Amino acid sequence: VAAFGLCSFLAPALQARLGLCGAASAALALLLLGTALRFIANLAAFAGGMFLLGAGIALLNVLMPVVIKTRWPRRIGMLMGLYTGMIGLSGAVGGLTAAPLFAWGGSLSWPFGFWTAGALLALMVWLLLMQCRTQGQSSESRCSAPKPAEDKERPLGLLRRTLRAPLAWILTGVMGLQSTLIYTAAAWMPSYWRSQGMSFETTGIWIFVFLFSGLPASVMTAKFFKVCPSDRTAGAVLSLLYVLGLAGWLAGGAWLLPASVAAGAAQGAMLSAAFLLMASHTKGGQGMLAVSTLSQGIGYLAAGAGPFIFGRLLQATGGWTAPFVFFTAVIMLWGLCVRLADTHQTVD
């Protein structure tokens, strides 16, 4: 998580040097190198691989929403939904397959190899798309030439100016708080279920259900926000849905399935909502890049504290009540940030 936050701030400089798609290609290469390094039976290589892996993911998290906004401005809702849905799906597949692959192969090389192959495939597909673009794709899908009306201000200068915009910090709260929720849930819900007598494999299944449920929800988030009377109403509904899911998790038994679906749908929609709010409150690609960098850089750094605070509360109180009260408070704070972001103002 620390790598996510710190490396996010490198995105504007990388984009200024390599261009938007070149920067995304470099991030994918880092992702592939990081996954490959984990095969080396050496602690330093493993740690370096994990850092490069986090750096690649962080850069892609910042850059891909900008690619969507600048290259497919008429399809932002659908493509942002698909993008965030795939993020959730990949996490769900990882949670579901890690233990079986390890048990089947008897080594961490099997799950590591699975994701190395995935990173290689992603890089190959991306490079193929870039090659198709150079061979005459439509102007809407092009990824190199800047638009005439694009911001003239340098990315780093715009980022510094964005730091002074109150709305940018509100959007950072929207991104950071939803990140806090998913990291905390993924880190501690399996431990809670294990304390209730659930097997390790079964906890993986429920985490998969939780993350997979976010896929259809994230795709439908743009339409959901349109049918709601206001963004603040949509934020309140998603917050309530997450709280109900959390209550079902704690109840256990027959409530686990509907609770996992409800919490997962809310979580997936929250991430999609964060990107949609960024897009709607920025005018150009450079403004989107600055807000995406700030919200994800600071947001991820703050989100890393979520699992730590949850664990400290568990240790200090000896029970699960205080940690889950903290979790509920984070949900409510997310809804408050969406309410504050319900404005016609833009950051840039």
Regions found by a protein language model. Name each.
Residues V1-F9, G91-A92, L211-V219, A303-G304:
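Residue-level signature of mid-helix packing/kink "hotspots" within the transmembrane helices
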Residues L6-L43:
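Conserved MFS/SLC helix-loop-helix module at the cytosolic interface between two early adjacent transmembrane helices
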Residues C7-G19, A217-S230:
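Helix-to-loop junctions at the C-terminal end of transmembrane segments
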Residues F51-G85:
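Cytoplasmic helix-loop-helix junction between adjacent transmembrane helices
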Residues R74-R75, L82-T134:
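Helix-loop-helix hairpin linking two adjacent transmembrane segments in secondary transporters
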Residues P166-F208, G214-A217:
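Extracytoplasmic gate region of multi-pass secondary transporters
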Residues P229-L277:
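C-terminal transmembrane helical hairpin of 12-TM major facilitator-type secondary transporters
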Residues G285-G319, F327:
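A late C-terminal transmembrane helix in Major Facilitator Superfamily
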